[in-house]
Amino acid sequence: MQVAAIFIDAEIEDQAQELRKFFKKLGAEISEDKSSKGIEDDLHKIIGVCDVCFKDPSLHTVEEIDAVLNSVVSIIVSIPLERGENLILAFCEKMTKAPDQKLAQVCLQSLWRLFSNLELTSPLRYHVYYHLVQVAKQVDQVKEVFTGVEQLKNQFTQCPPSNEQMQKLYRLLHDVLKDTNSELASKVMIELLGTYTAENASYAREDAMKCIVTALADPNTFLLDPLLSLKPVRFLEGELIHDLLSVFVSEKLPAYLQFYQNHKEFVNSQGLNHEQNIKKMRLLSFMQLAESNPEMTFAQLQDELQIGENDVEPFIIEVLKTKLVRARMDQKARKVHISSTMHRTFGRPQWQQLRDLLHAWKANLTLVQENMKSVAEAQIELTRKQ
């Protein structure tokens, strides 16, 4: 996200007095006179009434309000860090109170200016960013301030937030992303669970359940096996949500249908869509079949996936679109030929398979190298004889 840089051609004391006059004219309970206690007290009182400009937007243009808030931010960043914490927190809180989207957009820009102009080593950047995400949600611009977990971590490399602060931020990000970007929301929840240790994993029950539900509901998340290794998820072993996750990790469609038949109310109570679950389980079942069957007939797929004869080809096309499986469809022979597939689980057998494959490649490369060496030696010998 980019906004204009802060540049106010006036002394901060003069700016503060102009702001006092401006807010006074709007009806705010504030004196026009400078505070005898200094600029920090001026700023404290200005921030306390700055939201008065939100009450009747018709009195001023959005651009004018933006300029006023820009002036407030320019004073805030001039205050020494050790004395500015309460001022920054108060300003951030005011910026979340915009009554409509146009003003919320102005507040978003003001918070971004503040965030961008704080020292990279300032611990207050975390608090500004947290409120920034809240306001971005209001104007549907979360993607402008958050693009991924790595980008987030990079922003705080010089002053990392505490573990508890990151957990709070991850929960907020999940909440604002879950309805618009389920894939990214799922990644955020997995990152959140990764912040728990063996000592406190038992307290992450709610987060773990949200993480599982988000991953199951996301139509683009198919590799679910890593969730089972997360400590908070392990504490759910024996509970229905963990049993359901295990079905999605390694079982086929019939196992899910049986689970749903036995626990229909539970599945629905988690906000999961049964039809979407079936669709996902069919795809996961196909992947599992593809691991051990380089060739499958349409009839076999009909039986295994419980789909109609006319639905087989459209289903295969949908599978190929995910790029999880590479295959060729033979419509005449009514077969599908598998080239490769992503494994649903990656445990010891898969590591062994990968080891064997790499050893085979190594042996083949060694053979090629020896053959090339023999050809080169023969060529040299032939040249000598000539």
From Swiss-Prot:
Cross-referenced HAMAP family: eIF3m (MF_03012)
Keyword Protein biosynthesis: yes
Domain PCI: 181-343
Gene Ontology biological process terms from the UniProt entry: formation of cytoplasmic translation initiation complex
Alphabetical keyword list: Cytoplasm, Initiation factor, Protein biosynthesis
Subcellular location: Cytoplasm
Keyword Protein biosynthesis listed: yes
Domain of life according to the entry: Eukaryota
Gene Ontology terms for molecular function: translation initiation factor activity
Subunit structure: Component of the eukaryotic translation initiation factor 3 (eIF-3) complex.
Species whose genome carries this gene: Culex quinquefasciatus (Southern house mosquito)
Coiled coil segments of this chain: none
Name of the protein in question: Eukaryotic translation initiation factor 3 subunit M
Function (record text): Component of the eukaryotic translation initiation factor 3 (eIF-3) complex, which is involved in protein synthesis of a specialized repertoire of mRNAs and, together with other initiation factors, stimulates binding of mRNA and methionyl-tRNAi to the 40S ribosome. The eIF-3 complex specifically targets and initiates translation of a subset of mRNAs involved in cell proliferation.
